[in-house]
Regions:
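A C-terminal functional module that forms or caps the active site or interfaces directly
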Residues: 148-186, 191
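Active-site-proximal beta-strand elements of phosphoester/diester hydrolases
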Residues: 37-42, 140-142, 187
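His/Asp/Glu-rich mid-to-C-terminal helical/loop segments that flank catalytic regions of hydrolases
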Residues: 194-209
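Mid-sequence, gly/pro-rich, charge-dense loop/helix-turn segments that line enzyme active sites
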Residues: 73-161
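Single conserved hydrophobic/aromatic residue that forms the stacking wall/gate
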Residues: 1-10, 14, 207-211
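Short, conserved catalytic/metal-binding motifs centered on acidic residues
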Residues: 68, 141, 169
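Metabolite-binding pocket within alpha/beta catalytic cores that recognizes anionic/polar moieties
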Residues: 7-11, 15-114
Length: 211
């Protein structure tokens, strides 16, 4: 939503219209010369999937980009670093009693969704140009309806999914974008280490990453 944009970004945005659907406010406008729809999906995979489908159905978007924060699963990532999705997977999808590995979505050709290479490349260049001191990493995003804040769970996600960061929405957007044949990119600032200290680091970085 527009309140999450910096002052300079707001000055570069021309607001055309605003509509509320499924409890979410979709703002259409011109952002740096591009026709854009900005929206806050809410927390969790269902909210994100609903939001993405509305963007596809009602606004006919040609790409979707999700921004936010995530917990680090990669020891090379520090708080404040940026992760650009190479791919995304839902870590809480589990029908293993029926014979499929954890993370595999039954009756789907894909369970690991690949981000658009052009969007990844453009985002990496923009990130490095905006602040060369910030580490911008391309890696796997894993998502589930859980806030990861234990070393045990973190190690499980690393060993099982080889993820670089964990959050609660990105893979749902990727899943929905895949079903609609729409390119996607997830951009996440590392807010915490996804371990026993996660609940302390998250609120501070959430505020600064939105500023």
């Amino acid at each position: 939503d527009l309140h999450l944009l910096s002052r300079r970004q707001r000055q570069m945005c021309i607001r055309d219209s605003e509509v509320t659907k499924a409890g979410m406010t979709f703002v259409e406008g011109d952002f740096y010369g591009l026709k854009t729809v900005a929206v806050v999906s809410g927390i969790g995979k269902v909210n994100m999937a609903v939001c993405t489908q509305i963007l596809c159905d009602d606004f006919h978007v040609t790409m979707v980009i999700n921004t936010g924060v995530a917990g680090s699963l990669n020891n090379a990532l520090d708080i404040g670093d940026i992760v650009l999705s190479s791919c995304a997977q839902e870590h809480d999808m589990d029908v293993s009693p029926l014979g499929d590995p954890v993370g595999i979505i039954p009756r789907m050709e894909q369970s690991i969704f690949t981000a658009d290479e052009t969007l990844v490349s453009l985002a990496k260049s923009a990130c490095e140009k905006a602040n060369p001191d910030i580490h911008c990493h391309i890696g796997k995003v894993v998502s589930g309806d859980q806030f990861i804040a234990s070393a045990e769970k973190k190690n499980y996600l690393i060993e099982t999914f080889h993820g670089d960061c964990a959050e609660m929405e990105g893979a749902a957007m990727a899943h929905t974008a895949y079903l609609n044949n729409v390119p996607f990119l997830i951009i996440r600032a590392v807010s915490d280490k996804a371990d026993n200290s996660g609940h302390m680091d998250y609120p501070c970085l959430l505020y600064t990453s939105d500023a």
